[in-house]
């Protein structure tokens, strides 16, 4: 949030430059996700999350110092975006694998709901604060505040006292090489219809959502003439929406069925962005409409996130959690750099309104893929845990 807004509002970055900045920050997903999955299955997730939080705090702290010294131009932003992106890849894979090591499988939905709810709470104030700091004070101050929040996360995770169980390879087998473990994760995901559908649906969503967000961050300040504070406030509405989605995820799937919830929530959450290109002006009505759009998107996208995570964790053996999460991130989130670049290209060629409409329509491919897959037929209970032994790692 801070780096893209700084590029647009302070450096007057164009659509192509903003697309490139977002793509550089997302490129580590393609470069590191699969390796991160292999590491996570052999390390304590708490250790990895602590180290990566410390690294992100240091990187953004360095950006703050560079900004105060007048060195924070686009090249420096690209470096910081890449470093923070690389560390975030490892953190996210470890985060997704951590819960299975800490709770029983029948508590996964409730546990994911609680975890994602706490993460959503951070989204309520984060974007608004970041936008306000960039707009009212300066980008270095905003970067320093982000560094402080990562440091706070570092301290919080260090306080986790419960000991996690690390999956061990069979003693009779030599530990496999990293690339062999990566191949095992890929093969497991491709061989499971539900997981492979999650991959494809995630790829479709992330590709078009990245394009939407690149155009969105140009459309709000330039076409609608919104300040950085107003942009941050609009994006912050995703937070309370996601908090509501986390609470609903603990109840709705068991009442209406996991498949019904996945498909309908994805269609509603993704489809709401189709209303944004119709907005004009910077009136209070426009800001209110943006708040509603982001709230609805946050609610239903989080409902999908928590439900998908519970399904994935249930059908995956304990010793494969990191690699399966990383494979899905690689296929899904790996599309974001290309989507960001596409958003920049479309905005320059067609303008922001048309580009936003096309990219938002593309997001509906994700629920369509889920509707045509076995995921749509999931009932009110999670699938049975796998009995297949995990390949030695």
Residue ranges and their predicted role:
Residues 1-393:
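Alpha-helical transmembrane-bundle signature of multi-pass membrane transport and export proteins
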């Amino acid at each position: 949030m801070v780096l893209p807004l700084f590029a647009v509002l302070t450096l007057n970055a164009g659509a192509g430059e903003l697309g490139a900045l977002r793509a550089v920050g997302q490129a580590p997903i393609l470069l590191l996700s699969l390796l991160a999955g292999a590491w996570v299955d052999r390390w304590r997730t708490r250790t990895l999350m602590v180290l990566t939080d410390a690294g992100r705090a240091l990187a953004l702290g360095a950006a703050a110092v560079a900004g105060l010294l007048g060195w924070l131009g686009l090249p420096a932003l690209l470096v910081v975006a890449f470093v923070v992106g690389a560390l975030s890849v490892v953190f996210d894979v470890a985060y997704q694998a951590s819960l299975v090591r800490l709770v029983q499988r029948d508590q996964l939905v409730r546990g994911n709901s609680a975890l994602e709810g706490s993460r959503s709470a951070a989204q309520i104030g984060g974007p608004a604060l970041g936008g306000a700091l960039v707009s009212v004070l300066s980008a270095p101050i905003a970067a320093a505040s982000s560094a402080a929040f990562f440091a706070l996360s570092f301290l919080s995770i260090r306080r986790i006292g419960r000991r996690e169980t690390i999956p061990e390879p069979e003693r009779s087998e030599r530990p496999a090489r990293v690339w062999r473990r990566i191949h095992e994760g890929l093969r497991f995901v491709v061989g499971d219809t539900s997981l492979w559908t999650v991959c494809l649906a995630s790829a479709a969503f992330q590709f078009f959502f990245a394009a939407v967000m690149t155009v969105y961050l140009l459309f709000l300040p330039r076409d609608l003439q919104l300040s950085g504070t107003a942009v941050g406030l609009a994006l912050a509405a995703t937070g309370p929406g996601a908090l509501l989605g986390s609470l609903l995820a603990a109840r709705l799937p068991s009442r209406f069925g996991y498949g019904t919830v996945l498909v309908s929530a994805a269609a509603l959450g993704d489809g709401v962005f189709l209303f944004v290109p119709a907005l004009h002006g910077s009136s209070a009505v426009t800001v209110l409409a943006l708040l509603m759009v982001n709230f609805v998107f946050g609610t239903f996208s989080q409902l999908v996130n928590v439900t998908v995570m519970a399904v994935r964790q249930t059908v995956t053996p304990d010793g494969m959690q990191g690699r399966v999460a990383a494979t899905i991130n690689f296929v899904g989130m790996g599309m974001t750099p290309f989507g960001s670049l596409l958003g920049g290209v479309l905005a320059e060629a067609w303008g922001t309104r048309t580009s936003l409409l096309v990219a938002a329509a593309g997001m509906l491919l994700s629920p369509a893929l889920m509707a045509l897959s076995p995921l749509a037929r999931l009932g009110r209970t999670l699938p049975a845990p796998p009995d297949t032994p995990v390949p030695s790692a």
